[in-house]
């Protein structure tokens, strides 16, 4: 809310240079500028406005600025499907790369499995690594990438599904897995 008091013989005012969604009204000698900017911008934009008084033989004016920052943006820039991978527990993850832009100055990620990390270089957040071994059932890791900036955060979600490696347990007697045999002699129980 921006307010100005009309002085002397001024009875009204006009305001120019406001961004879309911002308006003004004059009531009881007060000029009020208010609203929500509805603009499609990708970088910070400065709107210089001018308020000019009316109703007096000599009009006065003043200026001000409204600076509008864009909302955050984020996009998956690695191959389609990299944000929904299924892999074995000791296989490396294909890199998942997100690019943040507009109002975003950084990004964070949560929900990654052990062994998988993220790093930021420039405006790119890369998720990579090899899930740690030791699971016995399929594990689904939903993760969230959230931008950091001055305005509304952008959020994207993905999943990493980790399958356990097939395992074997020796069920015959101990030592039967390392036998020394002679020709024509069967494997011992």
Q: What residues fall within each predicted segment?
A:
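A short beta-strand micro-motif common to beta-rich folds, especially ectodomain repeats
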Residues: 43-55, 137-149
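Low-complexity "stalk/linker" and mucin-like segments enriched in Ser/Thr/Pro/Ala/Gly
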Residues: 12-31, 107-125, 169-170, 180
């Amino acid at each position: 809310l921006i307010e100005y008091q009309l002085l002397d013989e001024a009875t009204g005012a006009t305001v120019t240079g406001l961004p879309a969604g911002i308006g003004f009204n004059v009531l009881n000698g007060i000029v009020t500028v208010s609203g929500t900017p509805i603009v499609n911008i990708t970088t910070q934009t400065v709107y210089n406005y001018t308020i000019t008084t009316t109703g007096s033989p000599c009009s006065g004016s003043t200026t001000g600025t409204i600076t509008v920052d864009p909302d955050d943006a984020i996009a998956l820039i690695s191959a389609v499907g990299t944000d929904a991978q299924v892999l074995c527990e000791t296989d490396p993850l294909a890199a998942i790369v997100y690019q943040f832009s507009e109002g975003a100055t950084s990004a964070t990620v949560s929900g990654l499995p052990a062994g998988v990390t993220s790093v930021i270089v420039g405006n790119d957040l890369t998720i990579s690594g090899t899930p740690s071994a030791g699971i016995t059932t399929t594990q689904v890791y939903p993760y969230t990438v959230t931008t950091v900036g001055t305005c509304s955060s952008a959020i994207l979600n993905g999943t990493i599904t980790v399958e356990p490696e097939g395992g074997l347990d020796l069920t015959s007697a101990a030592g039967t897995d390392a036998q020394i045999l002679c020709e024509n002699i069967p494997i011992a129980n």
